[in-house]
């Protein structure tokens, strides 16, 4: 219908049509997983066929392997994205799949890779990219890739990738080409059919596509047909490509815009114009053009006529086996009326060549399907007639179940006789059309001349068949069925007397013999063909081998293979086809005699971990869910087999059952415990002797017997009986899952088993494991100590009984389930239980065994993740070779567990131990561990990529990273790429954790303490000290100094390597990623990112500059400043200051700091009391030439304390958060300055006259007064207390004291020194002293006459330190001295606009001056500023390091004289005492 309205569709309609059609096609593919899997297998078969046809000595280059691997990885990642429900994982796998598939999509289509056309790989990639964009809900890209697929490779897209889509989009446009081809083929076929002059073009048209006509062609006719089909296929391809480009232009063109030309509709022109209108009777497979079989690889044309003919014969045979139904979508267009004599017949004995199981036919040579025709087999062995041909197209799945109608019983005799005539008259080829055979123009006499030739071939075939009388298998999916008992006699003919026998053995009476297992007598559920050619039910042959037999049950040939082959899917499909045609008969032979524990039971495959001594086999991997085996829901009678080849005779079974009956009766009804115990032992013996016959198992699986065994477990105290009961139950569960369901239905049964396990019965662990309990059950019974005991202790062996699973293996599996279940708290608690039960050494030792190794690794991993402190315990005992062997041999899940385990294990608290462990990992194993990890990294799921990347990077950095390394590049790229996944916060967090652990600061408890270590470097060492205190308490070994030194050197070397690799990767790309992480709304992520960024910037400036510093500055500087502004955490702000510190020395940073200077200045002032780095940054900031300090300065008066009632404030002193004041009337007051607004908390009146001076040393306060005393005070949080009074007989005007002596100034010249015990000594230098300052054993005295005297307190001598230039007019006096950071600050009368000088005590020279026109009487200094108080109530403020004036503060009282000045220790507050008895408090923020 599309062909009728296609010319009336405008561009919008075409886009709508494309959207609907392609979207529907892609949606159907995404929904049908089985179809995708089947399609991938078929494409892989074509690749394999091409590989097999090439030169086997030719090596495939690594680059070619990489391209093919990328395609495979991309398809696998896409499948994972389709199957997962985790949106984070889905998007990540889609990104990875796109990256992999784009490699193949962009290949040059004109070239080849490993013999495979690039166009094929590119089209395959485009198909999967179309799936990918559909999953992303991007319809535009989805359609674009689907159309690109047809442009790149129209031929294989039409036959392999999207035949349904080609039919909908392109076939309606190809009618003229199909018409031309039909006419040309008609013309050729008219030359082949004798006396065909009376046939018109439309009469019997379908006969011209009959496959058998090709076989009658002459060589020159066959060559013409080949050229015709080649030209036909090329025409379809070219026009498909033309229309695909047109559709693509329509999708990309904007119909609403008139600027871009509207795409022109192309016209599909055939090589010649057809003369007749297209017939509706042309089958769809003709319209599809030539179709290349999968087994032909990519050879588009046969090499010779022989090859062509052989391909025809093989394809016809393949079609006979498949018995496909009509194309589900093309039936209406391809209906061919069936002849009354031509109906489908049933399949009996057939021969299938494994190479042809997936052949697809071309319209000229490989289209028609014939039931009942064989190749390479005696023709007279056939009992089926030749039916009318079915129609086949690429849309017919080779796995589609046939839906043929049942044959008419009245036609059997007629068909059989005809078949016999055809069979005996085949001469040139083994396939001739039924329609031609019935034609009157072809005489039987003309054909019968070849009877002798056929007879010779039949005899040869029969002799070959006699060597393998039943079946022969070449590979896991190929099967040849032979039945010599129904072939003709030795003279090569089959007599007509055999016809009744054929009818008697037809499908209507019983199943074909080859569909029935010779052991069980039942139709196959899971057939496997042994190396001897015999086929058995998988479960039956498993039990045959388990009983100790090593030969084939029928041929008695020894079996060399230890593992059963995979399911014979060819035979299984035939059986399924037969069952659908004969449902009643199939039900009779599948169910009636199938016991509950029959071969169809999948219970064996449900047990993932078995160590059963010749019992364990790989359960079949069913690729088609439609053929999944169904378990019976009720007990059935024992199967009765009458086959002469049956191994287990029914008489023997009945004998065992009769022997069991009295013991079963005792077990179920007796009240005598010893009698029941004896019955259990006898039942076990008989069960063992039955060689696990399924019928015996079914008999013992009755609920009453199960309950009797459980009662024995509850009542008996005999260990042998208990263990034997468990043996019986275990065997029954192994065979039939319903036994486990019976036990699980009663909670007390599990409680009984748990009690037995706790009482030391190791075998109870086996039964618990087989019952598959949930985590809640295991957790409720607290089985971990008992499970560890089972693993630790040597188990007693059961006499003559072999358990299906070793109890130790079962215990480990249960332990794994227990540790992996529950929440984080439960996992931690359970891991602690394993560690406290001393289970770690036992589990580590258990790794030597292959069985259960995966579970052991999983358990140890759970222990390390829950209790990181056990890593050292494991690392000191483990042998890593078993873990690496498990990694190399395991699947993706096992590899992921191994990688996580190794990644956790190397996170030790000692770098030297880590390196030793890494060397072991690197050197162990038969394969290159690093290369294996690299390959796994490229295909690992997201949840394991970070672990393997971290591990691979550490292995690579064991050597100095001087040269380029693909391992290092891939690992670092993976870690950094994870940091960019802002949509997946969990992945970002894991990446940050992995990078922090790479730094190497790991505590003995297994946690990273990089943050505490960085804070300690910044001067905030409380977190580090607290951590070390805990670590030392848990540390019992006394490390030698040499060992600690080696550890320190190893860690420093390691950190330099890590920092160099991370910083220099792709020109500092990690800093750009960290910039994004710092913007996260997650506080935890931002904190981890800040720690990592701080460490990297600190390490960056210890490495040679390669241009990365500029990248780090641009990426991080502004982000960390934002953190400084927004964070409320002290630790975060200190980390920011540490990260900023390296940038201060960079001139390019100064401009940025100028912008943020004012905002960060206040924060840094608050932080400097906690962090020395903050103080250093603040100092550097204030000294930057680009920063205007006057813009940073600000102050505010907080409060004014009015103490005027006590007179003038003569002295102030700050100590331990308190401000002490000395007043005119002798009162001393204490103010609490720990809060922003100080308040008076104490007032004392110890002195009777004015308190002239206050000073402190240590925790002592010293006060001097005009009352001729010096008092000593202790300072407490609530005030001061006088403890000593020294009466010195004279008034004291100035005091400097410590615990050894006191220096004071009285009325006369010089200074007096008092050592607290002897009489004061006068040091007279004939000058009046105005101020004092003490530094060590030196006393500096500010004297009249503009000079400073230096007194040596050890020798009591003095000398001149400084002498200034005196003026004739006015007095020049040094009013105040103060020492700060090895500098002496002197306040003097203003001379030449200079009123203060700064001296270096070490150099004894002037290093600066304070320029002001006012006399400075008092001075106060903090870490940043100098405050100078004048007598007119003004305080001048200077920058301490540069001695530049910043600002001035005017006292509120106007020109009040400033009598005292003091700043707090943090430099945040300024206290000013004045002559009017007030104390003003200023906040310097």
UniProtKB/Swiss-Prot annotation:
One of its GO terms (molecular function) is ubiquitin-protein transferase activity. Pfam families: ARM_LIN, ARM_LIN_2nd, ARM_LIN_C, U-box, WD40. It catalyses: S-ubiquitinyl-[E2 ubiquitin-conjugating enzyme]-L-cysteine + [acceptor protein]-L-lysine = [E2 ubiquitin-conjugating enzyme]-L-cysteine + N(6)-ubiquitinyl-[acceptor protein]-L-lysine. Residues 337-363, 384-450, 462-507 are annotated as: Disordered. It is an enzyme of class 2 (transferase). Putative E3 ubiquitin-protein ligase involved in the rhizobial infection process. Plays an important role in the early steps of infection thread formation and in growth and differentiation of nodules. Residues 438-450 have a biased composition (Low complexity). The gene is LIN. The keyword Calcium does not apply. Residues 510-585 form the U-box domain. Residues 337-353 have a biased composition (Acidic residues). It comes from Lotus japonicus. This is Putative E3 ubiquitin-protein ligase LIN-2. WD repeats lie at residues 1194-1232, 1246-1283, 1409-1448, 1454-1485. Residues 466-484 have a biased composition (Polar residues).
């Amino acid at each position: 219908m599309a062909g009728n309205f296609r010319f009336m569709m405008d561009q919008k309609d075409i886009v709508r049509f494309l959207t609907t059609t392609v979207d529907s096609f892609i949606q159907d593919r995404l929904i049908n997983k089985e179809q995708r899997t089947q399609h991938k297998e078929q494409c892989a078969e074509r690749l394999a066929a091409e590989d097999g046809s090439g030169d086997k000595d030719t090596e495939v280059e690594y680059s070619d392997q990489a391209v093919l691997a990328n395609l495979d990885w991309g398809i696998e990642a896409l499948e994972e994205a389709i199957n997962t429900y985790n949106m984070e994982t889905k998007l990540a796998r889609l990104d990875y799949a796109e990256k992999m598939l784009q490699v193949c999509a962009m290949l040059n289509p004109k070239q080849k890779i490993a013999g495979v056309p690039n166009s094929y790989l590119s089209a395959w990639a485009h198909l999967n990219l179309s799936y990918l964009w559909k999953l992303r809900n991007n319809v535009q890209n989805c359609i674009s890739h689907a159309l690109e697929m047809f442009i790149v490779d129209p031929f294989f897209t039409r036959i392999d990738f999207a035949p349904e889509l080609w039919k909908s989009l392109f076939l309606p446009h190809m009618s003229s080409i199909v018409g031309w081809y039909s006419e040309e083929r008609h013309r050729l076929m008219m030359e082949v059919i004798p006396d065909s002059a009376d046939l018109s073009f439309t009469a019997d048209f379908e006969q011209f596509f009959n496959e058998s006509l090709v076989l009658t062609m002459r060589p020159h006719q066959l060559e013409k047909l080949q050229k015709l089909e080649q030209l036909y296929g090329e025409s379809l391809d070219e026009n498909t490509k033309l229309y695909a480009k047109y559709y693509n232009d329509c999708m990309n063109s904007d119909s609403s815009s008139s600027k871009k030309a509207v795409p022109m509709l192309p016209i599909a022109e055939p090589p010649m114009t057809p003369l007749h209108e297209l017939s509706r009777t042309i089958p769809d497979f003709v319209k599809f053009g030539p179709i290349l079989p999968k087994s032909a690889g990519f050879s588009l044309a046969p090499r010779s006529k022989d090859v062509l003919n052989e391909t025809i014969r093989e394809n016809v045979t393949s079609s006979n086996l498949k018995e496909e139904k009509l194309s589900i979508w093309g039936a209406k267009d391809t209906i061919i009326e069936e002849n009354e004599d031509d109906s489908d017949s049933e399949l009996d004995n057939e021969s299938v060549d494994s190479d042809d199981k997936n052949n697809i036919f071309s319209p000229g040579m490989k289209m028609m399907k014939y039931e009942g025709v064989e190749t390479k087999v005696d023709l007279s062995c056939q009992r089926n007639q030749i039916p009318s041909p079915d129609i086949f197209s690429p849309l017919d799945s080779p796995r589609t179940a046939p839906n043929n109608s049942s044959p008419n019983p009245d036609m059997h005799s007629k068909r059989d006789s005809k078949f016999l005539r055809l069979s005996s008259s085949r001469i040139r080829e083994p396939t001739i059309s039924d329609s031609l055979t019935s034609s009157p123009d072809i005489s039987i006499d003309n054909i019968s001349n070849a009877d002798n030739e056929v007879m010779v071939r039949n005899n040869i075939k029969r002799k070959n068949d006699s060597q393998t009388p039943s079946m022969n298998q070449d590979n896991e999916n190929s099967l040849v069925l032979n039945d010599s008992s129904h072939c003709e006699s030795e003279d090569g003919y089959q007599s007509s007397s055999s016809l009744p026998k054929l009818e008697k053995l037809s499908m209507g009476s019983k199943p074909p013999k080859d569909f029935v297992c010779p052991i069980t007598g039942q139709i196959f559920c899971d057939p496997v063909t042994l190396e001897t050619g015999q086929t058995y039910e998988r479960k039956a042959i498993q039990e045959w081998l388990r009983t100790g037999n090593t030969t084939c049950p029928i041929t008695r040939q020894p079996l060399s293979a230890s593992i059963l082959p995979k399911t014979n899917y060819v035979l299984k499909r035939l059986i399924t086809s037969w069952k659908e045609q004969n449902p009643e008969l199939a039900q009779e032979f599948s169910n009636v005699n199938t016991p509950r524990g029959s071969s169809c039971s999948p219970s064996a495959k449900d047990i993932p971990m078995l160590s059963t001594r010749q019992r364990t086999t790989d359960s079949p991997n069913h690729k088609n869910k439609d053929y999944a085996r169904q378990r019976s829901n009720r007990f059935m009678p024992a199967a009765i087999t009458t086959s002469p080849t049956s191994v287990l005779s029914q008489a023997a079974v009945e004998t065992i059952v009769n022997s069991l009956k009295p013991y079963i009766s005792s077990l179920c009804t007796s009240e005598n415990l010893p009698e029941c115990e004896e019955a259990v032992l006898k039942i076990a013996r008989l069960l063992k002797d039955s060689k696990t016959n399924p019928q015996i198992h079914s008999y013992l699986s009755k609920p009453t017997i199960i309950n009797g065994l459980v009662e024995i477990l509850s009542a008996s105290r005999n260990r042998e009986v208990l263990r034997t009961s468990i043996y019986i139950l275990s065997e029954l569960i192994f065979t039939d899952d319903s036994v486990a369901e019976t036990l699980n239905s009663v909670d007390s049964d599990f409680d009984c088993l748990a009690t037995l396990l706790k009482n030391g019965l190791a075998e109870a662990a086996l039964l618990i494991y087989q019952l598959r309990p949930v985590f809640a059950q295991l957790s409720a019974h607290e089985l971990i100590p008992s499970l560890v005991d089972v693993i630790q202790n040597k188990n007693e062996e059961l006499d003559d009984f072999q358990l299906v699973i070793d109890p130790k293996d079962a215990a480990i599996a249960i332990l794994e389930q227990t540790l992996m279940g529950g929440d984080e708290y439960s996992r931690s608690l359970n891991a602690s239980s394993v560690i406290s039960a001393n289970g770690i050494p036992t589990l580590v030792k258990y790794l030597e065994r292959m069985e259960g190794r995966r579970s052991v690794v999983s358990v140890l991993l759970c222990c390390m993740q829950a209790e990181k402190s056990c890593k050292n315990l494991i690392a000191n005992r483990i042998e890593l070779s078993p873990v690496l062997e498990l990694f190399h041999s395991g699947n993706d899940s096992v590899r992921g567990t191994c990688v996580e385990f190794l990644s956790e294990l190397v996170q030790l608290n000692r770098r030297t131990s880590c390196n030793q462990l890494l060397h072991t990992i690197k050197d162990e194993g038969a394969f290159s561990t690093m290369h294996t990890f690299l390959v796994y990294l490229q295909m690992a799921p997201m949840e394991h990529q970070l672990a393997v990347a971290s591990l691979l990077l550490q292995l690579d950095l064991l050597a100095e990273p001087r040269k380029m390394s693909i391992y290092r590049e891939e690992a670092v790229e993976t870690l950094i790429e994870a940091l960019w996944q802002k949509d997946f916060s969990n992945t970002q967090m894991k990446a940050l954790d992995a990078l922090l652990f790479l730094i190497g600061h790991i505590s003995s408890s297994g946690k990273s303490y990089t943050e505490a270590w960085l804070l300690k470097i910044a001067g905030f060492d409380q977190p580090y000290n607290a951590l070390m205190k805990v670590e030392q308490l848990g540390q019992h070994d006394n490390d030698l100094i040499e060992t600690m030194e080696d550890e320190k050197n190893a860690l420093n070397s390691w950190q330099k390597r890590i920092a160099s690799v991370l910083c220099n990767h792709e020109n500092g790309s990690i800093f750009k990623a960290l910039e994004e992480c710092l913007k996260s709304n997650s506080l935890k992520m931002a904190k981890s990112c800040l720690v990592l960024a701080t460490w990297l910037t600190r390490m960056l400036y210890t490495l040679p500059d390669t241009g990365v510093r500029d990248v780090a500055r641009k990426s991080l500087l502004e982000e960390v400043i934002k953190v400084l502004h927004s964070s409320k955490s002290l630790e975060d702000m200190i980390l920011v200051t540490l990260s900023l510190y390296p940038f201060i020395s960079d001139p390019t940073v100064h401009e940025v700091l100028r912008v943020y200077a004012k905002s960060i200045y206040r924060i840094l002032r608050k932080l400097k009391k906690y962090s020395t780095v903050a103080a250093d940054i603040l100092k550097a900031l204030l000294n930057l030439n680009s920063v205007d300090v006057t813009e940073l300065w600000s102050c505010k008066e907080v409060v004014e304390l009015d103490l005027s009632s006590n007179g003038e404030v003569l002295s102030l002193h700050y100590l331990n958060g308190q401000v002490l004041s000395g007043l005119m009337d002798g009162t001393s007051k204490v103010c609490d300055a720990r809060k922003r607004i100080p308040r008076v908390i104490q007032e004392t009146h110890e002195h009777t006259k004015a308190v002239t001076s206050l000073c402190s040393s240590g925790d002592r306060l010293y006060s001097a007064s005009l009352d001729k005393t010096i008092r000593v005070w202790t300072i407490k949080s609530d005030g001061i207390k006088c403890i000593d009074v020294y009466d010195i007989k004279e008034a004291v005007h100035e005091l400097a004291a410590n615990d050894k002596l006191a220096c004071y100034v009285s009325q006369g010249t010089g200074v007096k020194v008092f050592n607290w015990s002897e009489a004061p000594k006068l040091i007279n230098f004939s000058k009046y002293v105005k101020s004092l300052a003490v530094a060590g054993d030196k006393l500096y005295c500010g004297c009249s006459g503009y000079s400073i005297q230096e007194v040596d307190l050890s020798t009591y001598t003095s000398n001149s330190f400084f002498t200034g230039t005196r003026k004739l007019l006015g007095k020049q006096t040094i009013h105040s001295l103060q020492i700060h950071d090895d500098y002496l600050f002197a306040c003097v009368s203003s001379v030449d606009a200079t009123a203060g000088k700064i001296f270096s005590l070490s150099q004894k020279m002037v290093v600066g001056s304070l320029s002001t026109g006012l006399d400075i009487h008092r001075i106060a200094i903090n870490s940043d500023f100098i405050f100078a108080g004048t007598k007119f109530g003004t305080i001048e403020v200077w920058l301490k390091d540069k001695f530049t004036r910043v600002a001035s503060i005017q006292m509120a009282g106007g020109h009040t004289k400033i009598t005292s000045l003091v700043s707090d220790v943090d430099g945040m507050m300024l206290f000013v005492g004045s002559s009017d008895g007030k104390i003003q408090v200023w906040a310097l923020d």
